Design a protein with these regions (language model features):
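Macromolecular interaction modules
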Residues: 1-227
Length: 227
């Protein structure tokens, strides 16, 4: 409707042109069933904190050259949001996070969207907490022992980014970038299971000790800029 025409025709192009912004992508998120990705896996845990907004249907990713792009004094992004409060009032029940990259791992399809060259055609973003010091260390070790090696060989994956937050509820974030999500896909997780490399991780399953933001992870296809 009129909001999408304004968002795609005016606001997001202006955001992409703001000082310090590298690229912007708007994604239509796919609903996922409330069951484990594979039989026998732990059930994903979500926060029940009423202060955390529960919207999930759309994600706008904005890549900046530094956190100053979003948090520095007198930045263009703040000014743009302040100038468009009427249009942005349509963004109900939404939440924001500012992340920095902890680790970037290229996948087999890296050539499709080289680093820094724009938003991927499809993506999955997760935001979550590991609530104890010990669990945060477990999480860091698991990513390095199992998930990062799999990203490098997972079908259709451009790259994976592990992130840490500057603002927002979640301490941890991940952004998995892909060439596509098929008509029956709602997650990249089955591809990571396919890509097992005999890692023999001896620790607990990651879902046993992380708490996701509402609806996280969110997987979707890019709707702006059009694929």
């Amino acid at each position: 409707g009129a909001h999408w025409a304004w968002l795609h025709g005016e606001f997001l192009p202006a955001l992409q042109s703001a000082s310090g912004v590298a690229w912007v992508g708007h994604y239509d998120i796919i609903a996922h069933p409330d069951r484990p990705y594979i039989e026998g896996a732990p059930t994903r845990q979500e926060t029940t904190d009423p202060a955390i907004a529960t919207g999930w249907q759309n994600v706008v990713l904005t890549a900046g050259v530094s956190t100053n792009t979003f948090l520095g004094p007198d930045n263009d992004v703040d000014a743009l949001f302040a100038a468009h409060t009427t249009g942005l009032a349509a963004w109900q029940n939404h939440r924001t996070c500012t992340f920095i990259e902890e680790k970037v791992v290229n996948g087999p399809e890296e050539r499709v969207t080289p680093y820094g060259m724009g938003p991927p055609p499809a993506m999955q973003i997760g935001s979550f907490n590991a609530d104890t010091t010990a669990n945060n260390e477990l999480l860091a070790r698991w990513y390095r022992a199992e998930r990062f090696p799999r990203i490098a060989v997972s079908r259709g994956i451009i790259r994976g980014r592990k992130m840490l937050s500057i603002t927002g509820w979640a301490k941890h974030g991940v952004l998995w970038e892909g060439t596509e999500l098929g008509p029956d896909d709602y997650s990249f997780e089955p591809r990571f299971i396919e890509a097992a490399r005999d890692e023999n991780w001896a620790g607990p399953h990651v879902l046993e000790y992380v708490t996701h933001a509402p609806g996280s992870p969110h997987a979707g296809r890019r709707v702006w800029p059009k694929v």
